[in-house]
Amino acid sequence: MNVVQGNIESKNAKVAIVVSRFNSFVVESLLEGAVDTLKRFGQVADENITVIRVPGAVELPLAARRVAASGKFDGIIALGAVIRGGTPHFDFVAGECNKGLAQVALEFDLPVSFGVLTTDTIEQAIERSGTKAGNKGGEAALGLLEMVNVLQELEQQLQD
């Protein structure tokens, strides 16, 4: 039986992190968690990490698409925080962001890790950005590192 699975270490991986500035009090902690994870667990060098800042979560897919189209990166981490308010705006922003990022991954055959918090309250967002519920930016980075490795391993298996 052949089993294809990745590991976390990706010393030579080139990673783009597309970051929403909206709700920056939460998103900056997600970014810190992602970068720390890439460096400590993935052994990714500083020069192989590029941070791209965009206004909000709706802009994440377009920036991710441009990054993917460049062919210069092994994967993309998208970070943001969409916090529910009193209008249906939350549903549109969260849904379109998720759908757009998934489309980029499929269109360019490139791992795109979804590190966009979608929470009902500010407290939930803070908990998920490095306090009670861990750091979802770091978790997104772990997922990306594994997928970069899985796809490389799968490519080798399919060529044999």
UniProtKB/Swiss-Prot annotation:
* Entries under InterPro entries matching the protein: LS, LS/RS, LS/RS_sf
CC annotations in GO: cytosol; riboflavin synthase complex
Q: Where does (2S)-2-hydroxy-3-oxobutyl phosphate bind?
A: G86, T87, R128
Pathway membership:
Cofactor biosynthesis; riboflavin biosynthesis; riboflavin from 2-hydroxy-3-oxobutyl phosphate and 5-amino-6-(D-ribitylamino)uracil: step 1/2
GO BP annotations listed: riboflavin biosynthetic process
Q: List the disulfide bonds.
A: none
Q: Which UniProt keywords apply?
A: Riboflavin biosynthesis, Transferase
Give the active-site positions.
Answer: H89
Q: Name one GO molecular function term.
A: 6,7-dimethyl-8-ribityllumazine synthase activity
**Signal sequence, renumbered to the chain:** none
Question: SUPFAM superfamilies in the record, alphabetically?
Answer: Lumazine synthase (SSF52121)
**Keyword Transferase attached:** yes
Residues binding 5-amino-6-(D-ribitylamino)uracil: F22, A57, V58, E59, A81, V82, I83, F114
Q: What is its EC number?
A: 2.5.1.78
Listed under catalytic activity are: (2S)-2-hydroxy-3-oxobutyl phosphate + 5-amino-6-(D-ribitylamino)uracil = 6,7-dimethyl-8-(1-D-ribityl)lumazine + phosphate + 2 H2O + H(+)
Give the UniProt family note: Belongs to the DMRL synthase family.
Note the subunit structure. Forms an icosahedral capsid composed of 60 subunits, arranged as a dodecamer of pentamers.
The record's function comment reads: Catalyzes the formation of 6,7-dimethyl-8-ribityllumazine by condensation of 5-amino-6-(D-ribitylamino)uracil with 3,4-dihydroxy-2-butanone 4-phosphate. This is the penultimate step in the biosynthesis of riboflavin.
What the entry lists under HAMAP family is as follows:
Lumazine_synth
PANTHER family from the entry?
6,7-DIMETHYL-8-RIBITYLLUMAZINE SYNTHASE, 6,7-DIMETHYL-8-RIBITYLLUMAZINE SYNTHASE DMRL SYNTHASE LUMAZINE SYNTHASE
The name this protein goes by in its record: 6,7-dimethyl-8-ribityllumazine synthase
What organism is this sequence from? Shewanella woodyi (strain ATCC 51908 / MS32)
